[in-house]
C-alpha cells in the first residue's frame, strides 16, 4: 500500500489491456492466403468435423481461422479476409473467415442471417418454403 506522498510522486500505473486477436494489429479485418484447408475435431463434450484454414496474413503472421457456414470453396492459395472472433470448442482458433468476400463464396441457399454468411437475397419470383408445413 503506497503512502499519499508516494502516490503524488509516482501516481498509479494503468494496466495495459491484452487484445483477443493480436494478429489483426488493431485492424478490423486483414487479408491473407490459405496455406492449408482441413477439418478438426472440437473439445469434449462436442463432436463434429469443423472446417478450418491455416492462413498467412499480409503482415506475415500465420493464424488458424474458422470457415463458418455449410460448404465452402476454399483451397490452398485462396485469398481470404479474416476477422476476429474465436470458436469456443476449437483451441487456438481465434479468427473467422469472412464469407462472400475476395475468393470466399457466400453460403448457398441461405435464407436467414444472410449478411453474416455473404448470401445474396433470394429471387422474388420463387416462393420461400413455409416452415412447419412439410410432409408428415
From Swiss-Prot:
GO cellular component terms attached to this protein's record: small ribosomal subunit
NCBIfam families: rpsL_bact
PANTHER family: 30S RIBOSOMAL PROTEIN S12 FAMILY MEMBER (PTHR11652)
Molecular-function GO term, any one: tRNA binding
Residues the record lists as 3-methylthioaspartic acid modifications: 89
Function field: With S4 and S5 plays an important role in translational accuracy.
UniProt protein name: Small ribosomal subunit protein uS12
Quaternary state and interactors: Part of the 30S ribosomal subunit. Contacts proteins S8 and S17. May interact with IF1 in the 30S initiation complex.
Coiled-coil region: none
Keywords attached to this entry: Methylation, Ribonucleoprotein, Ribosomal protein, RNA-binding, rRNA-binding, tRNA-binding
InterPro entries: NA-bd_OB-fold, Ribosomal_uS12, Ribosomal_uS12_bac
Region listing for Disordered, in residue ranges: 101-136
Biological process, per Gene Ontology: translation
Pfam families attached to this UniProt entry: Ribosom_S12_S23 (PF00164)
UniProt family annotation: Belongs to the universal ribosomal protein uS12 family.
Source organism of this protein record: Pelodictyon phaeoclathratiforme (strain DSM 5477 / BU-1)
